[in-house]
């Protein structure tokens, strides 16, 4: 199936890394295992500071679903278990042993039964790689998905491409073969053919995949690479019984690597990007999963008060300035550095804005079609917070047929019945990144949707055994 997305916004941001290769490998002294994505679920920590661990060691367990573990991908020593507000678990910091873990595992994918395969996924931390719709929560082992979607079309700003992720391996062919094994494992685990969504320019091993997966291509501006867009156009979620699991290309590589090579894939490709980074520092690196920012960034950038440190892309990433020793998030492959101006732009309301980005034609640039211009973005809001406006401008950048303003209003009043009627079950917070970005009222739609999905999920599916 070929999907063409017309709505969205092609964000051309300054600060992208150079496309010409990599700038080496970095073996960080410290890494962390990010537990923030599991906030909707109560976790039981299985380690203490000072414990020696190896790749595959269980670090935390789902309390409500015993036997599902979050595991380490490196060898080392547990240094700290960090907690936030109300003692919520944030991450587990590990002092990493130099080099790649040599802890070996022996699993024969073809010999394992479906039940045995599920136990392997739960024990080795592979099940925690899946996310579940509705609600955009960690996948639950008690749920049987209607479909599984594998995303090879991620086009968030500065996010490394599929080709960049394949640089982890000796050849592109080797990387694709590992991916095929991962897809085979997913197909066997759930007894279905997953949906693989990629871009036209990718040369996938079609002959190896066609028997175990449905292949689709998608084209269009961001958010054409969002899983919500893929699900909406291929197999839409109609009610809360339509369970769909989603997983990224990189996470499928982790699954395939364990079954084919017998080792945890402890490395990842990271993009260092953002207009606050000097051009010479904008690059791709191969480093350990969850690497410390301090090991990846120049000291003058890491310690600067004039920049914003973001784990992830500039639209959906986590702001890390207030963290003592920030590390990459669980699903993040980008570190974004943006300017953090301390003063307002002089007479900004009187400027013509020829080089300003606008969707609402606030500036002169909105009235002319020009060649691609790269925008130099910073963290200024360019105005104060105002009441939300009921406008169709949000739908211009939304790739799914969900009325943005009415849905946000329903969520703010906790009218979940109305919110579900408007499409809450289909969405994730990422779907509101662009509406938040262009919103004249400065409403934090991303945060509103995220909190509402967690709250509604706790009332409906996240109940203890």
Swiss-Prot record:
Q: Which domain of life is it from?
A: Bacteria
Enzyme Commission designation = 7.2.1.1
Which chemical reaction does it catalyze?
Answer: a ubiquinone + n Na(+)(in) + NADH + H(+) = a ubiquinol + n Na(+)(out) + NAD(+)
Q: Give a GO molecular function annotation for the protein.
A: oxidoreductase activity, acting on NAD(P)H, quinone or similar compound as acceptor
Its Gene Ontology biological processes?
A: sodium ion transport
Q: Which keywords has UniProt assigned to this entry?
A: Ion transport, NAD, Sodium, Sodium transport, Translocase, Transport, Ubiquinone
So what family is this one in? Belongs to the NqrA family.
**What's this chain's function?**
NQR complex catalyzes the reduction of ubiquinone-1 to ubiquinol by two successive reactions, coupled with the transport of Na(+) ions from the cytoplasm to the periplasm. NqrA to NqrE are probably involved in the second step, the conversion of ubisemiquinone to ubiquinol.
- Subunit info? Composed of six subunits; NqrA, NqrB, NqrC, NqrD, NqrE and NqrF.
The name on file for this protein is: Na(+)-translocating NADH-quinone reductase subunit A
The gene designation is: nqrA
């Amino acid at each position: 199936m070929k999907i063409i997305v017309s709505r969205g916004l092609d964000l051309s941001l300054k600060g992208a890394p150079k496309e010409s290769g990599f700038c080496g490998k970095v073996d960080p002294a410290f890494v962390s295992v990010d537990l923030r994505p599991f906030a909707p679920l109560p976790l039981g920590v299985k380690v203490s500071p000072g414990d020696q661990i190896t790749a595959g060691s269980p670090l935390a367990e789902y309390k409500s679903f015993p036997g599902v573990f979050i595991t380490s991908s490196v060898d080392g020593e547990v240094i700290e278990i960090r907690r936030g507000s109300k003692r919520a678990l944030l991450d587990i910091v590990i002092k990493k042993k130099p080099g790649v873990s040599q802890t070996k595992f022996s699993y024969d994918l073809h010999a394992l039964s479906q039940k045995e395969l599920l136990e392997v996924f739960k024990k080795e931390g592979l099940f925690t790689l899946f996310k579940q719709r509705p609600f955009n929560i960690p996948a639950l082992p008690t749920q049987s998905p209607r479909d599984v979607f594998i995303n090879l079309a991620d086009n968030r700003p500065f996010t490394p491409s599929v080709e960049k992720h394949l640089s982890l391996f000796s050849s592109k062919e080797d990387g694709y073969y590992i991916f095929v094994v991962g897809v085979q494992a997913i197909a066997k685990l759930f007894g279905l053919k997953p949906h693989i969504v990629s871009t036209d320019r990718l040369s996938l091993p079609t002959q190896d995949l066609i028997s175990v997966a449905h292949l689709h291509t998608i084209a269009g501006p961001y958010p054409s690479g969002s899983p919500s867009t893929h699900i909406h156009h291929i197999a839409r979620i109609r009610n809360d019984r339509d369970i769909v699991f989603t997983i990224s290309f990189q996470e499928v590589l982790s699954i395939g690597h364990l079954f084919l090579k017998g080792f945890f894939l402890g490395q990842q490709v990271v993009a260092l990007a953002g207009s606050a980074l000097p051009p010479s520092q904008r690059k791709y690196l191969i480093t350990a999963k969850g690497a410390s920012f301090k090991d990846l960034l120049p000291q003058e950038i890491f310690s600067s008060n004039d920049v914003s440190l973001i784990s992830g892309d500039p639209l959906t990433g986590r702001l890390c300035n207030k963290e003592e020793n920030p590390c990459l998030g669980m699903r993040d492959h980008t570190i974004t550095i943006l300017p953090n101006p301390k003063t307002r732009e002089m007479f900004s309301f009187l400027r013509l804005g020829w080089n300003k980005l606008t969707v609402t034609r606030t500036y002169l640039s909105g009235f002319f079609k020009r060649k691609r211009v790269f925008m130099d973005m910073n963290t200024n809001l360019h105005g104060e917070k105002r009441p939300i406006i009921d406008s169709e401008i949000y739908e211009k950048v939304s790739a799914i047929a969900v009325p943005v303003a009415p849905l946000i209003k329903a969520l703010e009043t906790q009218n979940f019945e109305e919110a579900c009627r408007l499409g809450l079950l289909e969405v994730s917070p990422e779907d509101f990144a662009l509406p938040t970005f262009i919103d004249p009222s400065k409403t934090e739609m991303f945060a509103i949707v995220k909190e509402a999905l967690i709250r509604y999920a706790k009332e409906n599916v996240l109940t203890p055994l």
